[in-house]
Amino acid sequence: TDDDMGNSEVGHNALGCDQIYSQGAKLVGESIESGALYESKTWKSLISNCKENEKALHFLGLLSDGNVHSNISHLIAMLQKARAEDVKRVYCHILLDGRDVPATSALEYVDQLETVLAELSDSAHEYKIASGGGRMVITMDRYEANWPMVEKGWRTHVQGEGRQFASAKEAIETYRAENPGMIDQDLLPFVVAHDGKPVAKIANGDSVILFNFRGDRAQEISLAFDRKEFTHFDRPGYTGVHFAGMLEYDGDLKIPEHYLVEPPVIKNTLTEVLCKAGVHEYAISETQKYGHVTYFWNGNRSGKVDENLEVYEEIPSDVIPFE
């Protein structure tokens, strides 16, 4: 729309189905505005876990209003609702953008978030930023191109490992001073700490919400939280959390198991029509766009419609920084 930035994922959805659906930011925004998100079984379960078991609530995601992967307004709305429902301890693990928004705009969003967190905090309620880092350095890998990047995020958010700062603002300003020209997406991981101890680590039994709505860069960290059987990196001491994504990021693979907003069901995609007609289809791309010509093209579904009619070929991308 005129208000929201488009992207190649939404474009491939549209090309692959030739239909109009509410998705991503609009879908989530409608759910928040109507209150449907807060009436969902998943939201209620996450909140009741915090209150009944005295657990913390954690929000993890991209902190910006780029409206491509996430929107800070969604995070703020959920923070305010959590406070209204008397959740005592709430922590934000923020990924810095600089890609879908101006390259060095992180402090604008951090300041906005810190203002809200201060308003929600009092002697009985602790609402704080706990950790973070650049989106192209930790947590938000896609298409299994760089699992060590996800592991860095895990160690930062869950284990509280990494360079410590008194605040997210101090971390950003320090990294910029030490690395002239570095943009937000490339900022190194940081842990907010007081007296040498992390403000909050994601602990076993806590409630965790991944507030990104786009699926490609949300799936791998979702698997790390969601799956008992997980082999991509070690998760020392981890026995599980109450985890939910903003949306179901992959319907076929059921990633994640729990989510806050029901995704649109995209039917009668071009691939389905071609397969019904017996037409062969060949999809080829390098890794970083492979999901666009398969997953997004096919209506946010993994796998093939017809193994006998479709051929997918992935050309591995080089693992290099995105500028």
Give the label of every model feature segment.
Residues 15, 190, 305:
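Short clusters of hydrophobic/aromatic residues that line enzyme substrate/ligand-binding pockets
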Residues 15, 210-211:
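Short hydrophobic-aromatic micro-motifs
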